[in-house]
């Protein structure tokens, strides 16, 4: 089975290449899928979230039964090494997974705002554009927010996501972190901007799928 998954990953690699042209070059050679382990780091925290239709649910609804890639963003972020970078990586991975049928139905993305005062469900829908629903069986990409900073707090604290607010309270900043979560809801990898690259993330997804068979 490991050989089959590795072969599938190698077949997917050329398809991935044309999606990463605008991303910084990979500074290291990622090990092949299945040649390493990703140990449990922590259980993903629980909290209340809202989808783009304003429907409330527990975050755990979006973190089980599939491999989940979760990133915190805010829609007004202009730091090229922050939210825009994460968005480009997620977008490249989405296209690569669409080209890899063996990954269909096994992966989801979650983009969660940490600016609930501005990032309403309606605004998150506009931010998502056409990415909310994948009709080709590739994956589902959820864009979520919260009702208030109070409901957001246990999530950012639980994930260890650093957020800073300017003295005037008008500007936000954060250190980019993206979380790879297994089908049981455990964080298995945390990516910073230096290590967030579609090929390394794709290899980690393949490794988790091999590990959880």
Regions found by a protein language model. Name each.
Residues 62, 76-86, 117, 121, ...:
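Solvent-exposed, acidic/flexible segments
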Residues 42-44, 62-69, 104-109, 119, ...:
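Extracytoplasmic
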Residues 42, 66, 73-76, 81, ...:
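Sec/Tat-exported extracytoplasmic proteins
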Residues 85-155:
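Structural microenvironment flanking redox-active thiols in thiol-disulfide oxidoreductases
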Residues 57-58, 188:
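Generic structural signal for well-ordered beta-strand positions
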Residues 58-89, 109-110:
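Short active-site neighborhood of thiol/selenol oxidoreductases, capturing the structured segment around
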Residues 151-213:
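Thiol-/selenol-based redox modules, centered on thioredoxin-like
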Residues 1-46, 50, 212-213:
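N-terminal targeting signals for export/organelle localization
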């Amino acid at each position: 089975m490991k050989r089959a998954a590795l072969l599938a990953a190698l077949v997917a690699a050329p398809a991935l290449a044309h999606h990463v042209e605008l991303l910084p070059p990979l500074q290291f050679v990622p090990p092949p899928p299945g040649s390493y382990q990703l140990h449990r780091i922590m259980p993903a925290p629980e909290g209340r979230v809202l989808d783009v239709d304003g429907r409330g649910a527990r975050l755990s609804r979006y973190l089980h039964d599939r491999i989940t890639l979760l990133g915190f963003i805010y829609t007004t972020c202009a730091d090229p090494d922050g939210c825009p970078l994460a968005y480009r990586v997620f977008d490249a991975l989405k296209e690569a997974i669409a080209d890899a049928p063996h990954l269909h139905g096994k992966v989801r993305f979650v983009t969660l705002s940490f600016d609930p005062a501005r990032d309403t469900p309606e605004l998150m829908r506009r931010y998502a554009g056409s990415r909310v629903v994948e009709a080709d069986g590739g994956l589902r990409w959820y864009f979520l927010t919260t009702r208030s900073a109070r409901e957001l707090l246990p999530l950012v604290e639980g994930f260890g996501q650093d957020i800073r607010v300017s003295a005037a309270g008008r500007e936000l900043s954060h250190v980019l972190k993206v979380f790879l979560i297994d089908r049981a809801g455990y964080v298995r990898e945390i990516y910073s901007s230096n290590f967030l690259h579609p090929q390394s993330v794709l290899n980690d997804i393949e490794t988790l799928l091999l590990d959880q068979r």
